Structure formats: C-alpha cells, structure tokens
Amino acid sequence: IGSEPILDCDSAGHWRRCMQGHAGSNLVPVLAANRIGLETVEPCEANGGQKSALRFYGSSFIADETGALVADGTRDTEQVLTATFDLDKVEENRMSWGVFRDRRPEWYGEITRQGRGV
C-alpha cells in the first residue's frame, strides 16, 4: 500500500483504520504487511509506454481482535513484527459478543455460490 502521487495524499492512516475496523467487526486478529521504498515503472510496450512511481509507506502492524494495535512497524525500515494470541480467549471474546449469532446463511447462501447472482 502506497501513497498515490497523482492524488498527493498519504493514505496510511485510512488504510490502518480500515484494517483495524475489520479486526474489531469480525473479532479476529489482523496482521497487515506492507513493503517500503520507492518503486518505479519504466515505459515499455506491456504498460502502454507509461512511467510511474509509487512510494510504499511500510507501517505494517498487528491488531488484536478488538482492533487495538499490539505491534507497529515504521514507515522506512524493514522489520519483522510478531505477536502472541491466546486463541481460546479470542474465541471466547468472539462468542460473548454474539457477532455471528444472528447470521442466517440459509437465507442468502444461494447468492454466494460461484456463477450465481441476484
């Protein structure tokens, strides 16, 4: 995930908040890995003669099942992040919230099958 030069913005915060939200809404830990540095694309026939560059902003992280950060990477250094989770506790937390209690896949399962639609 990088900052798009055309948009002149830094999407790191938005990306991180979205991923933390996925962790919290599904009550599962999320590990988000990203690379660092500038990558350039030189013009060639395969890319239609376009030249571009994208700066990857690192910021890899690990969030627990509530979305809280438990490991945090930097923007410009290669790193290995680790975290340990008590999976029984994670499961207990997920069950106590009842997040999936009201799911009714038998009502919508047909539209999730390959080649099917609404």
Show which residues each predicted segment covers.
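Short, surface-exposed linear patches
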Residues: I1, Q20-G24, T84-F85, N93, ...
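A sequence-level detector of short, solvent-exposed, charge-rich linear segments
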Residues: L38, E42, G49, F85-K89, ...
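A short, polar/charged loop-to-alpha-helix boundary motif
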Residues: T77-M95
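Cysteine/selenocysteine-centered motifs that mediate thiol-based redox chemistry or coordinate metal-sulfur cofactors
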Residues: V90-V118
